[in-house]
Amino acid sequence: KAVATRQNILVAGGTGTGKTTLTNALLAEVARTTDRIVLIEDTRELQCTSPNLIAMRTKDGVATLSDLVRSALRLRPDRIPIGEVRGAEALDLIKAWGTGHPGGIGTIHAGSGMGALRRMEQLIQEAVVTVPRALIAETIDIVAVLVRDGHGRRLAELVRVDGLDPRGEYSLTSQGDI
């Protein structure tokens, strides 16, 4: 439902938890739409079979993830999925998702829904001193958290980001028992 309603989804978890696998499953749903997709990543991991796909990859000394996010905006994208968010490009990404390009998907290393939002803050601080918490809260709709434990890989937490509470903290709502 989140893909169909063009919500921005952040897939979080540690190494080997299945972030890329879940993101590829979500991209398979995106591929069923007629949306123009500009897929951005460092390493070719994501797979999208959409006929309306433009895939962009970083190149050392030539194009960073931030460069590609900004370039993607010139390509009239409907959706901007990104491989792994790991640096200052987090700011460019939430700006892009929040200014007419909803329906994005991205991955991040974090162990909880709140942790994923706080990690976004840390990454954004690589670009600016003051973190735009309201923009993060307005832009990221869903956080899916994956874990790998004795039972294998699984979805441990699925939360909706409702905005900021009166104290300025993120307000999250669990999306059911997992």
List each model region and its residues.
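Conserved lysine of the Walker
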Residues: K19
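P-loop NTPase switch/communication element
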Residues: N24, A28-S71, A116-M120
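Walker A (P-loop) phosphate-binding loop of P-loop NTPases
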Residues: G16
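Phosphate-binding P-loop
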Residues: K1-R6
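Hydrophobic anchor at the beta1->P-loop junction of P-loop NTPases
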Residues: V11-G13
